[in-house]
């Protein structure tokens, strides 16, 4: 376990060094997200982002391990990350379920330790965790899709065909919410993608 974390830290430092090579010592501001997503987590992220700017950080690293939480706060966190002036990276140290998946997809790069999971973003209601009506699922699918699409796409010409290649596949993001979306090689039509 310690070796895996050490390898990740070394890889991340190399990634930041290559990206921000003009700085001899890039400043990485780490924000831990290791509880359910809610109003406290949202305020914690806002404070961390302000502190990163005040300390002239080069980027933010979210260290994430969450089973999810409130869609409302997750949407606020997603929007803040998408609009933030510094790059925001996420290291998933076990779980980025549900609301955590939405937040992770908003980040500039996603890093995961071996055996970590991301996905299972179906909206649930009440204490029993039953699936919310399709109105809510539709909105969450749209949010996941738009977040993935926000990272852009490349136009590739192959054998006189023009292909669109998404940097983050919006269908994969939607499949984390809707079991009817099939991603070849990942999930069948009876499973939510994780």
Which residues fall in each region the model found?
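Bacterial N-terminal signal peptides that target proteins for export
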Residues: 1-8
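Bacterial N-terminal signal peptides
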Residues: 8-17
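Soluble extramembrane regions of membrane proteins in the secretory/endomembrane system
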Residues: 22-194
């Amino acid at each position: 376990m310690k070796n895996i974390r050490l390898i990740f830290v070394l890889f991340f430092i190399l990634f930041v060094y290559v990206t921000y090579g003009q700085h001899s010592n890039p400043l990485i501001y780490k924000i831990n997200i290791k509880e359910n997503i809610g109003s406290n987590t949202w305020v914690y992220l806002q404070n961390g982002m302000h502190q990163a700017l005040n300390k002239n950080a080069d980027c933010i690293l979210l260290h994430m391990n969450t089973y999810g939480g409130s869609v409302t706060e997750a949407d606020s966190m997603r929007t803040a990350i998408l609009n933030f002036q510094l790059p925001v990276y996420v290291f998933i140290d076990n779980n980025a379920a549900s609301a955590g998946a939405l937040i992770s997809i908003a980040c500039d790069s996603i890093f995961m330790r071996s055996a970590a999971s991301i996905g299972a973003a179906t909206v649930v209601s009440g204490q029993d965790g039953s699936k919310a009506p399709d109105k809510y699922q539709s909105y969450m699918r749209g949010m996941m899709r738009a977040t993935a699409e926000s990272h852009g796409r490349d136009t590739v010409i192959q054998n006189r065909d023009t292909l669109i290649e998404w940097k983050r596949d919006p269908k994969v993001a939607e499949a984390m919410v809707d079991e009817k979306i099939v991603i070849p090689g990942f999930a069948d039509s009876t499973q939510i993608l994780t």
